[in-house]
């Protein structure tokens, strides 16, 4: 490898929500800080204003989910996916790979998700295997997998890992959530798993910060309208505390306008809170959905402050990921779970009261997932290089 930086090809896409993009960006920043050169292959719809600490970014013809059921996939222009369109994606991916010399290929979520791109990933791996110094193949996966899989899908995932991957980075602390909670075949791939810790944004210096007693957030806001409306009803009646509702940029303009028009004077409505975890640390209660990124912010706030969490997992479109995560976090004592399908003002009021009584959990949580991932990758690449040198 000489004096050249180890090089990574990081393949990812988001199909609907934006959480995957921001987690990928945090990982890429950590890889760059570790001295790894990163080439990004971006397979989803590009997000305005989002950049990466990468040497290059290669955009494929985008794929997106039609809705939150993820049962139908569309092009970036909301058109039906065709065989020709997917073939063009594959050609674009292989063309990008032809100009790169990665020491490792990382696929975010795949093969535990993103099945729609399995053919192009298969082609990429076959092309990589033909190279004299074939790159390591690494999967990057979050803590919880989506349930309700069709028969045979888990076995398919397992076989991909056993046959095609060298390592799986699980971005979780196994003392809090382990992959086996949602992947029953985990024992078949145990030797390839490495738990990195949770991936969270770096702590920000927020010495001057507008403080609120209760913060309500819903990630990007695409599925947060109901939570925001019910939270506002509770907030308006709670005159003893200041509230802040962070709607997310994807809540409809009409819904956001209605919230602002009906908010009492002690309730602040914003589109986005920069450094959400830091804001939570100055609050007494966090009410949020339970996507990966937001739940990690809530855990970090629990560890560093007196903030307590109410999780309102999105569960109304057949998705199980948030509900399972929220249930596990409630079981561990990190919050109170009220599924969105059961949400009422009274249920939310009771959950806030229950959350206030939660004791602080003394267990230290590993939040160094990004830096640890970078360190593991460097070690694996260097070990592969030493092994190759020995053989030659």
Residues of each region from the PLM?
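Conserved nucleotide-sugar donor-binding subdomain of glycosyltransferases
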Residues: 75-118
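A short, glycine/small-residue-rich beta-strand->loop->alpha-helix junction that serves as a flexible
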Residues: 12-25, 224-225
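A nucleotide-sugar donor-handling region in carbohydrate enzymes
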Residues: 140-225, 246-253
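Donor-nucleotide binding loops and adjacent catalytic segments primarily
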Residues: 28, 198-285, 323, 341-342, ...
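Nucleotide-activated donor-dependent transferases that construct or modify glycoconjugates
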Residues: 3-17, 107-109
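Conserved nucleotide-sugar phosphate-binding/catalytic loop shared by glycosyltransferases and other
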Residues: 4-11, 30-84
């Amino acid at each position: 490898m000489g004096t050249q930086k180890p090089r990574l090809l990081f393949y990812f896409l988001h199909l609907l929500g934006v959480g995957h993009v921001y987690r990928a960006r945090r990982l890429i920043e950590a890889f760059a800080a570790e001295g790894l050169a990163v080439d990004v292959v971006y397979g989803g719809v590009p997000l305005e204003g989002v950049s990466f600490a990468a040497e290059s970014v290669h955009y494929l013809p985008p794929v997106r989910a039609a809705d939150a059921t993820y049962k139908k996939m569309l092009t970036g222009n909301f058109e039906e996916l065709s065989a020709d369109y997917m073939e063009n994606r594959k050609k674009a991916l292989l063309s990008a790979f032809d100009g790169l010399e990665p020491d490792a290929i990382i696929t975010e979520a795949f093969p535990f998700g993103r099945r729609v791109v399995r053919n192009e990933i298969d082609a990429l791996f076959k092309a990589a295997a033909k190279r004299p110094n074939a790159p390591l193949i690494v999967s990057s996966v979050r803590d919880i997998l989506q349930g309700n899989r069709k028969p045979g899908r888990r076995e398919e995932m397992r076989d991909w890992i056993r046959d095609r991957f060298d390592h799986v980075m699980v971005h979780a602390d196994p003392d809090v959530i382990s992959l086996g909670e949602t992947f029953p075949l985990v024992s078949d791939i145990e030797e390839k798993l490495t738990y990195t810790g949770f991936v969270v944004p770096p702590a920000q210096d927020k010495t001057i910060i507008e403080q609120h007693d209760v913060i309500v957030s819903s990630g990007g806001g695409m599925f947060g309208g109901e939570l925001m409306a019910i939270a506002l009803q509770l907030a308006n009646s709670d005159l003893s505390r200041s509230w802040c509702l962070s709607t997310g940029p994807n809540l409809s303009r009409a819904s956001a306008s209605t919230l602002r028009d009906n908010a009492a004077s002690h309730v602040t409505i914003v589109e986005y809170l920069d450094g959400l975890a830091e804001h939570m640390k100055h609050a007494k209660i966090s009410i949020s959905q339970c996507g990966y990124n937001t739940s990690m912010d809530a855990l970090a706030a629990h560890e560093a402050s007196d903030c307590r969490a109410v999780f309102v997992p999105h569960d109304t479109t057949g998705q199980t990921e948030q509900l399972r995560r929220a249930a596990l976090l409630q079981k561990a004592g990190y919050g109170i779970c009220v599924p969105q399908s059961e949400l009422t003002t009274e249920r939310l009021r009771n959950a806030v009261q229950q959350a206030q009584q939660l004791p602080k959990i003394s267990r230290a949580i590993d939040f160094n997932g990004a830096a640890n991932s970078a360190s593991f990758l460097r070690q694996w690449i260097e070990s592969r290089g030493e092994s190759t040198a020995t053989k030659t």
